[in-house]
Amino acid sequence: MATHSSRSENKDAGEEDELRRRNPYEVLGIPSNSTDQEIKSAYRRMALRYHPDKNPDDPVAAEMFKEVTFAYEVLSDPENRRLYDTTGSEAVGPENEDLELDLSSLGAVNTIFAALFNKLGVQIKTTVSANLLGEALNGTVTTLPLMVGQVVSRKVEKQSAHFYSVTLTEEEAQDGLICKVHSSAKNKFKLLYFDQVENGGLSLALQEDSRKTGKLSTAGLYFFGFPVYRFDHRVNSRALSRDPETGFFKRLDAFQPFEITELKAGSHVFAVYGDNFFKSVSYTLEIFSSAPFGNEKESLRSTEAQIVSKRTELLKFEAEYHEVFAQFTEMASKCTGEVQEIDELLKRRNEICAAYTIFPPTKQGSSKSRSWSKKKSSLLMEPREEGEVAVREEGGVKKKKWYNIQLRQDKKKN
């Protein structure tokens, strides 16, 4: 059994290494300078083709789906893509991947575990149901027509979507369009925009996940005729968790432009996708012209231009920081070495100076003994009157003793 387990582990490791060696751009069939939108479109097209739900009991399709998913995980994350482009596939491993799930394909037990992990803070990215995307691509979904300026409040089931179509005139398209969705219950949802394909089907082109802001969860798509940016806070959190000290420099990596900046006159399709784990999603959708918000649009353009400039400055600052930090580390190490060397030299000098003496070294124990003997003698013998000596005995009682009394001489005189 141990041998079988070892072979299985080696096989899994070999498959993972093979995935790493595959060029993700080649897997998705796109050039290395592809935009985020081109990467997403290629992934969705191939994921639909090789999805296990559409190819049951097909090991070749399952393997291709695994490769396509791995390639997308590398290229869809700005940090992972930069790592791959600069250092190669060996730098991109499982630790850099996000967990991305199609909740519609999970059983009840797996969904419970996914929800639990999400509650514990594990970043779980969810995808739009492959079956739903397939239906949209085949043109079998139902769309509800809306007018510009119309507001709709509804409830959509989990892993399902409501599709809406809006028709723009030339003037409305030129003015710009805003599509916003919010949920007062802070439900999770995705705001989707679809391109129309030749066969009358719909291909997912834009996706914006809801984000909690105050008492609401919101998402928005903006078509102003100039680049508008999105900011994924999850990418910043991952950068900080990987390297808290230098994660600051990657804070704006997730500040990326929307792939579509303007809409042409004609019909356009949006959708709201329920992204809760268990319950339906209550939401309010509004589609309106951006013409009344001319000042806000210019303010947004100016502010985002400053953020983009700051992102460029951060890249330069990061290079300078690493250079200065390396110099500081070297200087700190040198300083520690100098302090140790100085301490050793001073210690050696003190030892040499202590050797310059003509007196022999004394034993500390015998010196203390002699001192105590002298002190004890002085305490025992206390001088009094001539011929009288007070002797202090151990009991503390003093006895007088007389010496040198010439009794015999006194008798002779008498």
Swiss-Prot record:
Signal peptide: none annotated. It is found in: Membrane. Residues 296-324 form a coiled coil. Induction: Up-regulated by mechanical and gravity stimulations. Expressed constitutively at low levels in seedlings, roots, leaves, stems, flowers and siliques. Residues 1-36, 362-395 are annotated as: Disordered. Residues 23-88 form the J domain. It comes from the Eukaryota. Keywords: Chaperone, Coiled coil, Membrane. It is a peripheral membrane protein. Its main location: membrane. Residues 1-24, 382-395 have a biased composition (Basic and acidic residues). SUPFAM superfamilies: Chaperone J-domain (SSF46565). GO terms for cellular component: membrane. PANTHER family: CHAPERONE PROTEIN DNAJ 39, DNAJ DOMAIN (PROKARYOTIC HEAT SHOCK PROTEIN). Plays a continuous role in plant development probably in the structural organization of compartments. Seems to be involved in early gravitropic signal transduction within the gravity-perceiving cells (statocytes). Belongs to the DnaJ family. C/III subfamily. This is Chaperone protein dnaJ 39. It comes from Arabidopsis thaliana.
